[in-house]
């Protein structure tokens, strides 16, 4: 069995990785341009995302790769990968399987909207729960 790790491609060097070797990533629905979520990638996650055409992130809390949908089935098929003008943010244009990107069971992680004024305002959930998270994660 070959246990050698294949070297990572040189194009990864164009990305401006932070001091922890990570880059912020925004996932956007390709068909609607809805912003679905924000996450992080390391070099291996970005390379695997491009190789598999499925979103792979890096979990800072678990300190490991996180294959989007590995537990929920709500995978993201990647249509495009873009790098911003400063080369320090990645944008994934994805097809969100089942329409649920958020662990709360919503379409987007950005479901809270600020309403009111600076002195009398609050964050309000404005998008519906599409599926109870207790039925998503077992």
Curated annotation (Swiss-Prot):
Alphabetized SUPFAM superfamilies for the sequence: HisI-like
Predominant subcellular localization, coarse grouping: cytoplasm
Keyword rRNA processing belongs to the record: no
GO cellular component, as recorded: cytoplasm
Family: Belongs to the PRA-CH family.
Source organism phylogeny: Bacteria, Pseudomonadati, Pseudomonadota, Betaproteobacteria, Burkholderiales
Pfam families in the record: PRA-CH (PF01502)
Organism this protein belongs to: Burkholderia multivorans (strain ATCC 17616 / 249)
Keyword flag Cell inner membrane: no
Record Gene3D superfamilies: Phosphoribosyl-AMP cyclohydrolase (3.10.20.810)
EC primary class: hydrolase
Locations listed in the record: Cytoplasm
Enzyme Commission code(s) on record: 3.5.4.19
NCBIfam families attached to this UniProt entry: PRK00051.1
Assembly: Homodimer.
Cofactor binding remark: Binds 1 Mg(2+) ion per subunit. Binds 1 zinc ion per subunit.
GO terms of molecular function: magnesium ion binding; phosphoribosyl-AMP cyclohydrolase activity; zinc ion binding
Catalytic activity: 1-(5-phospho-beta-D-ribosyl)-5'-AMP + H2O = 1-(5-phospho-beta-D-ribosyl)-5-[(5-phospho-beta-D-ribosylamino)methylideneamino]imidazole-4-carboxamide
Residues binding Zn(2+): 85, 102, 109
This protein's name: Phosphoribosyl-AMP cyclohydrolase
Keyword terms, alphabetized: Amino-acid biosynthesis, Cytoplasm, Histidine biosynthesis, Hydrolase, Magnesium, Metal-binding, Zinc
Residues binding Mg(2+), per UniProt: 84, 86, 88
